[in-house]
Structures are given as structure tokens and as C-alpha cells.
Amino acid sequence: MDFVTIADVKVPVLPHSNKFPVFPSSLVETDSVKQTLQKILYPMLEGIPVLLVGDAGVGKNALIYYINSLRKQPTLRFSFNEDTLPEDLIGSYRILLDGKGFTWSNGPLTNALSEGLSFVADEMNLCAPNIIKRFSSVYESTYLDLLEGSGERVNGKTGFWFIGTQNPSEGFEGRKPLPFDITKHFAVVYVDPYSPDEMFYILKKLYPMLAEDVLKQIIRISLESEARIKSGEIGKGDLEKYHFNLRTLQKYCNRLVLFGAKDKTVAAREALYLFEEPFRKKEDKAKQRELIESEFGGGIKVVPTKGYVQGSTIFWNDKEIKTWDEKKTISLLSTYPTPEPILHFLDQVFTAIQAKENILVEYREDQDPQEFLPLFTELTGIELESVMLSKGMHTSDVVGALKPTEEGNIESVTWVDGPLTRSIRKGHIILISGLESAGAELVEKMNMLTDDARSLTLPPESGEYLPIQLTEKSIVFGMKSFRASKSVTSISRAFRNRFTPILFPELEDVKVLEEILEFYLPEGVLPRSLARFHLKAKELAEKRTIGSANLMPYRFGIANLLKWKNHIYRYNQTDVKDIAIRGGKIYYTNQIADPKERKELERLLEGFLSGVEVVSTLFEEIEEKKKRLPLNQD
């Protein structure tokens, strides 16, 4: 028998089937990592299941991948959630495609037992304890009775190892402590966060091309930012669960390697993008900028954004991103207005795309980026697949399920991919919306998809035992609105930490709004009047000058303004003023419940549009503007 030494522990290398993957790992053995590995390895050698507990980003799964990569042992990992059922792990019967019989498909736990593999129960405390107890014989005595199938007993083959991972219940959505009658069968190992010295040692090992002073600077920024969050100095009013750790630091280092390891401007810019930009409140941003500037020695120069498309490549400042449909990319860039806030937003998106990061676009409810969605999700020319989540949905709704064939015969069924599975197979851009409303039962199912594994395990009825992998060109976008109150659910900081958060800009400056409107409308009084009335209506609604009797204030967002513009486009006639007033009523005043308030807002609308001449050349100018745009905007 062959052996390998891991953290000074001699571990056997066992024979295994080659049909399951062995995940690579770049874990660096520091002193604390070595100690944690020993805490894991000795119970493993004794055949005792291990439960790893620790904060997001401390490397719980990385530890297992590291051990198994050295001993060449495949790992089957299943992301638990509140929707997990025993058959997801154990297996189930499915009808043959010809409808003339049934076949049994093993679940990942059954496969791990019968093949002698490692099984990782990821985020185990998201699952109800009564579900976990269905396979208690596995972690108690290393066997499983297939009650859902033939009833036979599957004994764990030599090499089988059961590992659970979980975040602490404190500070993580949907987590509850596992009862003692479950945990007593495990060797529970708490995985400590890395010390500053260990962070430096790890980063230096992984990124030897980066200067030591740069690594020390960003570690200090990360630690101070995390300390400020925990003390409530920043992020408190946001109601979001911010978190900075080694994963954030690795993102930063990857970006420096991509965009300029020795360029101080790049080093400062990426620090701002990762440690200042995610915060909503201006005072939080100011504190973070001050921290970053103090580390980098003064004010940080803002470089104007420049971009063009050539040779199937998007050149955007110092970024170069392949486009799979050059004509579509050029068309999108020509179809949407790009004032400075949008350019700054796009620069952050392109940075994350080139660095192959998952992107979380966050926005205020009245600043929904829906109107600009294709501009940042489809610029690479790859087809977009939307996965819309909501409360009450089941995992099968997005992953897939067995369904009757087109003939409708109940005895003939086939596996039908859900939108998430379909998009992975086809290599599409994946846009996951409704993250804030879906709850942990759906969101946490995507853990493997959004971390280093970049894969999704399908249920047994799919007939596929190997996880399906994201392609190189796939990008995962998440979209969520800001949390408005503590009673509103949000994503956990564990899930957030797998994404790069980018805030969609708040388009509220009158000059910016005029620039957006002047992209579609002739410059002058009309776009100026529309922008100013929009901001006035927003101000009155926010101050409750209108809607004071309502439980909820009126909301007027960028969507109202652009739909108003579209109305003028669609019904453009010689009397542009009347069309504009009608559009303003449709998208602003008609929703006002109080007749007096509605009348007053209509009076303001007519006042703001009083400068638009009743009969003018504006009609012809709008028609000419429409002809010059690449796509018809009506």
C-alpha cells in the first residue's frame, strides 16, 4: 500500500474508481492549517466522521480537497438546504424513456459508500435534523439501507469518509445548531480564521510576483475593514452582511496579476473596488476611502474610461475581454447612454468578468438596473439565461425534474433541465434574480456553482452521477435589491462572499439624467424638463409631501423616467408637448390616490413642460434622432 504524508501524518493512498473527479487544491500549509489538518486526519484514519465548523471563507472545503488531492481520492459534495430530501442523497427510481419499466439511480451518498469515496455534506445545518437522521446509520455505523429502493444494505467500502461542513448559526441566514444526538457521532473541528502573518505567508506563496509591501497594505485594509464592520463603525445602517477575508484578498491579488503587479494606480483602484465600493452609505464610503488613501499615500487618481471593440475583443481601459459576437457588442454599446456613473459601473463589471469572478449587482428599489440589463450582462455576446427565484419555489423548479413526455403519457417521462441546469450545459451567461426573496432553501443550493468547484450536482432521477461544470465563457450574475428592514430576508454573508458585489449607480443628478435623455431626445428644453420634473416628483414622494396618508411612500425610479421617454418616442406627433404631458400622467400622476395631490402634481407637470412649444420642429428632430440610433427605442 502506498502512503502520503500530510501535515506530518502518514495517510494511505487507496485504489478507487476513475469515473469520479479528484478536485485540485492550492491550499498553503501554515502552522494553523497544519494543526487543523491533523485534527481532521486522525479521526479520518480512525473511521470517524468529521464536522468542520467555521466562518465563511476560512477554507473548510479547501481542506478536504487538499487532503484528497494528495491521496488522489475523489470527493462527492452535496450542497444541503432546507429543501433537501432523503432521496436527493440516497437515490430514487425513474421511469425508463420508453415507459416500459423503472431503473434505480444512486444518489451521491450511496455512490460514495459503494465506491469508497469521500462524501461532503456541505452546509449540513441548513437541512432539517429529521432529514439528516434518515441516514444516521451512515455516520454511526457506515452503512445505508436502501429503503427507498431494493431494501438492500450498502456497506461503506474501504476509503469511504463522511465529512460535514457548516457555518455557525450566528450571523448566517437559515442556519440552526445541529442537535447533540447528531453531533456526538462526529469529531467536531472548529476552523479558525487566518492570522495576519498567515495571510501574508499564504499570499506570498500564491503570488510571489507581488511586492511584499503591497500584500501587507491590503491585509491591513482587510483586517481594519472587518474590524469596523464587527464594531458597527461601518455597514450598520445597510442591514447587509459584509465580510472581508482571505477570499477577498485573493481576488485582489488576482486582479493585480492581471492588470499590473507593479502599477500603484491599479493597486489603489482595486482596493477601492473591493473595500469601498460595496458600501451603500456615503459616510461609510468616505471612511473606507480615507483608510485606503492612508495606506497608498494620498489621493487616488481617477483615470477616464476609454473603450472600444476590435478584433472580437473589448478593450476597456486596461482590460481585454473576448466577445463571442462582435456585432452584438458594438450594437449594445451604441444603443445605451453611458454617462460617467454608468461607465464607472461598467469598469467594475468588466474587471470582475476578466478576473472570472461571480458578480452580485445590488441596487435600490427605485434604481432598478433592469432598463440597462443587456448593457452589462450580454456585452460578451453570449446568450443570457435568466433564473428568477422567489419564495415558495422548489429546487426542482430551477435544477430540473422528471416530467411527462410531449405525448403526455403518464407512463412515459423524461428528465427536463431547469433554467439553471440548462444554462450551465449550454455555456450561457447566468442571471440569478430574486436572491433576497428566495430564502436559504434555494440560494444555498448554488454553493458549489459559485465557489471554486464551479459545478452543480443533479438529483439521482436525472441519471447523471457526475456534477455538471460551468464552461470557461460562463459568467454568473446575481441581482438583489437592498435590504429595507431587518424583517426582510437577505442572502447570508457566506453566499455573498462568493460574489463580487457591485452597486448599480443611483442616477439622481440632474445633469446625468439630462445626458441619458439627450441620448434619445434632441438637446434642450424637453430632456431638461423631464429630468427636473422626475427629480421634483421623487423629492415630494420621499418627503411625504404627497402620499402622507399612505402606509408606503410613492416611488419614482429611473424606470418611470425611461418609460416616459419611450411614450414620447412611440406616439411622437407634431404636438410633442401634449404627448409629454400625457406620458407624465401615465407614469407619475395617475397613481396618486388623493385627488388634490394628483391635481397639484399635474399642475407641476404642466409647469415644468411649459417651455416646450406647442407647435415646433421638435417632432422632426425626435424622428431624426430615432433614425440615428442603432435600434428602434419605441
Regions found by a protein language model. Give the residues of each.
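AAA+ P-loop NTPase catalytic core and its hallmark functional loops
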Residues: 1-238, 243, 247, 255-262, ...
